[in-house]
Structures are given as structure tokens and as C-alpha cells.
Amino acid sequence: LPEIWGQVEKDLLEASNLLPEEWTGAEKGRITKGAAKALLARAYMQQHLWEKAKEQLYWLVEGEGKKYYGLVDNYKHNFSHLTENNIESVFEIQFSDALNGGESDDKGATNGHQRSIIFGLSGIGFRDGLARPWLVDEYKKERTIDGKLDPRLRVSLLYKDVATDFPDEETGKFYGKTWAEGKWGNDVYYRKYSRDDFRTTEDRHSQLNFRVIRYADVLLMYAECLNELGNTEDAYTYVNMVRARAQMRPLQEAYPEIGNDKQKFLSRLQTERALELNGECVRWFDIKRWELYNTPEGLAALIARDPDYKNFVVGVSHRQPLPSNEVANNPNICLLYTSDAADEAR
């Protein structure tokens, strides 16, 4: 594992030194210096190398790269094909529906992706990757400065009461159907990267670019690094920037009991990341970095929100069991597995 992390660091340091700070014109959307630095910061954070991660993120947040990034006014613009490669995009994978000639790597095959249909509502898509119901509850725990529900809720998730919760923004139909007509029951679906606002069905050729890293994520990562390094007071600034876009009160006002307590701040930051970044492929890495799977206390916090974690056993459920046929065919596999486990224990 140290060798792998070492190679990741080497590659991304080299990339950040060679890549341009920005691309323009037809080249816009290609990976940049800032993207390499943000990816490297992620790698450092997973290793708890907070000072190194902070150094990389500083370039984007307060350093020379700050001029290239910001938060878009409308949260939804991060998940629309009409507002791609915007100021909030740090690393964005480009997709297109121009070619729909199949799903392989052959010439003329699709340039789109399949997330929209795989995560789609039953009857519209495959209903894989359902969102967790506790997310809806978490969004509803706090109101905006105007007393309304968090606007990120209706952009992020589709659920039974979304039309009732947002009567001014919703028509009550999704892909041309009411919730009752769709027979979607109590399921909670990810709305991010869906196309319900301009289609009545989904296919395997979605043109929506996938935002691997948004500037909001960078700000929250920077806040986490500051907090871990003992600078909780300054960390508030960057969380509040993300909350302000959602019309939420500053963290100090909403949760004064946190103060400068490092653990209380981290606990709230964990929730802030879930509210801002759910469905964007960061949750598993977050939970692993916070080591919530490693202790009964961390696991209890997960179970309190999501009872499905009751099946998880600390020290046992971290990996899937080795297939019996692989063990039978390779007499060395158990030896290698035991050695790796011993290395991790040390």
C-alpha cells in the first residue's frame, strides 16, 4: 500500500507541475493543474497527511489558483448539461449524446454514460443505487434563513413528498408521471444526473458531464484539514461559504454548541459533506477516512441513521470473503491474504 500511495503522489505532483492552470475554447474541460492538486489532496487526506493536503488545496482556495474557481449561484447548475465546465468545476469528465451507436468501445459507439438509467426510477431506469431515506430527514432538520427547506434537497433527491415540500418549484410530475402513477412508493432516488426535467424516459447515452470534484468539495476538504490541524476557528469560513449558497445560516449561529471543539466540528462537517455531496461518489471514501467502520462508536453513529449497518461487524465486514474456488485453486492465496492483514494490523 505505501508503494501505491507513493506512485499516486509522484504522478500527481508531476501532473500538477506540467498541466496548465486553465484551458480555453474547444479545449475547455480538460484536466488542469487545479484538478491534479485537488486529487492529490484527496490522496493525502485518505492517509491523514493533513498538512500536505492543506498545502495542495491552498493553491485553489487562497493561492494563485483562486481566481479560476468559485461557487455557482444555482446548485442545480452543477448537474445540468446546459451549465457544464462552469466556475465550480475542478475536475469534470466530458460526455455527449452525439454518438449512440452501441455501448462498447467500437468506433461510433456511445460517448454518453449510463448512470442516469442505472440509478433511474423504477420503470424509467433500473432502480439500482437507491439513496438512503435518512438523507431526506437530515435535510429537513434545518431551515434556510427564509424559513424554507434546503434547496439542495429537491435537486439531490426524488421522493414521495418532493412535490408537496416544494410546491412552487415542482409540477408534481416526474418523467411525465405523478408519483402515484409511477408506483414509486417510499423509495428515495438520486435526482442528480437524472434528466427528468426534459425527458420522459432514460437511456444509456446520457450527455451530462460527471463532476468528479467540485469547488464546494474543495472548500469542505480545506475546512477539514484546518480542523485536523487545530485551526477550527478558521475552518468555519469555508463551510459557511458552502452553506451560504444554500441560504443556510452560518454554522456558528445554527450550532453555537460546537464552538472550537475539534470533534464536534468534525461531526458536523461529516453531515455537511453528506448534504452537499451525496450521490457524487465521495461517501465511501469519507467514511473510510473518518474510520467510522473501525470502532463500535463510529459504527453506532452510522446505525443511528441507517439500520442496515446493523449487519456490519467491526473487524469482519471490511472485505468480502475470498471465493472458495479461488482458495481451492491457489494454495498461496491464504498466505498472501494473511500477510496483507498482518501488515494492516501493524
Residue ranges of predicted features:
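Flexible helix-coil transition and linker loops at the boundaries of alpha-helical arrays
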Residues: 20-27
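Short edge-strand/loop segments of extracellular domains
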Residues: 61, 238-247
